[in-house]
């Protein structure tokens, strides 16, 4: 019975943090014969949203060689069942651990190290525990951004519903924090055909859900530059798939730390950007936070590092690229 509960909890968590695989090309679902598509159809599908110009600056603030952007998707109860309408007390208690124990532990470490981070909230995660905003904002160096309404599968929604939920989320976060979020990270890191238009229409500064590069870049929609900064993510640089594989075994925090250190060292060598995504309810456990502690220690020892929020990075690369003119 205990094993079954563990498997259920792990499956819910991993499913919530895995990439959505929907690829609907018709109103009735995925086209079963894409090999028969015309060249125009293939190019149109691929070019909906594409990576445009590289926005990696010649150097980062203070002459730093590499930018380090730490982010936390504060999903809590939303991925522990709420977004699917599943009410199961055990998984929901794991979500509460995120706000009750893990987030304060993470912020305490960051504040002690003087390292800023960006916290992406599904609005309901913040509404259920608004005291999280006070914990994050106490130092004045962190950012709170938006990660949907209830970690909904935005790529499966019609345009009016997707926009309504994002507007609700932005307004709710602003009401709780006193500041309108300027950054967006799509739930499950996926776009609908309408997501980019909605994000642009709502005046957000940057987006951080896509994976076309290791460096910041400008998003292009149907071949047209949009002026939207993309700060790309990557599943290798996400704690969820590394700490929570499909099954009932867990990765060693020190093994995970080594993956991140190797990624950072290569980013440092290339002079680009290291963007890491974590979740308080995953990495905020006592045995796992050692991975973040060790990573920060390694990065500081390496030198030539600029630690910034996603907002600060987006503003900087826009300025360096002349996008504010």
Language-model region placement:
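Bacterial N-terminal signal peptides that target proteins for export
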Residues: 1-6
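Generic enzyme active-site microenvironment
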Residues: 71, 145, 307-310
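C-terminal motif of bacterial Sec signal peptides marking the signal peptidase cleavage site
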Residues: 14-16
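C-terminal domain-boundary segment and adjacent tail
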Residues: 206, 218, 254-325
């Amino acid at each position: 019975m205990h094993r079954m509960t563990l498997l259920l909890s792990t499956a819910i968590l991993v499913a919530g943090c895995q990439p959505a695989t929907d690829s609907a090309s018709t109103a009735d679902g995925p086209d079963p014969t894409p090999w028969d598509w015309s060249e125009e159809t293939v190019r149109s599908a691929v070019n909906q949203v594409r990576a445009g110009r590289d926005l990696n600056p010649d150097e980062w603030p203070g002459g730093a060689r590499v930018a380090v952007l730490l982010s936390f998707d504060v999903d809590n109860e939303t991925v522990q069942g709420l977004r699917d309408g599943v009410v199961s007390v055990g998984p929901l208690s794991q979500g509460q651990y995120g706000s009750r124990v893990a987030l304060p532990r993470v912020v305490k470490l960051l504040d002690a190290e003087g390292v800023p981070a960006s916290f992406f909230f599904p609005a309901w995660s913040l509404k259920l525990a608004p005291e999280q905003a006070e914990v994050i904002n106490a130092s004045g160096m962190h950012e709170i951004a938006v990660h949907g309404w209830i970690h909904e599968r935005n790529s499966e929604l019609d345009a009016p519903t997707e926009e309504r939920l994002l507007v609700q989320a932005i307004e709710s976060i602003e009401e709780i924090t006193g500041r309108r979020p300027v950054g967006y990270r799509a739930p499950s890191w996926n776009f609908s055909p309408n997501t980019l238009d909605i994000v642009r229409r709502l005046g957000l500064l940057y987006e951080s859900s896509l994976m076309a590069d290791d460096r910041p870049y400008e998003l292009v929609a149907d071949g047209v530059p949009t002026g939207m900064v993309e700060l790309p993510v990557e599943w290798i640089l996400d704690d969820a798939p590394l700490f929570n594989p499909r099954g009932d075994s867990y990765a060693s925090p020190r093994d995970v730390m080594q993956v991140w250190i190797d990624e950072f060292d290569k980013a440092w060598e290339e002079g680009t950007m290291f963007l890491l995504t974590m979740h308080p309810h995953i990495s905020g456990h006592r045995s796992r936070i050692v991975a973040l502690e060790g990573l920060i220690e390694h990065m500081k020892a390496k030198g030539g590092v600029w630690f910034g929020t996603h907002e600060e990075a987006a503003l900087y690369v826009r300025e360096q690229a002349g996008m504010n003119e």
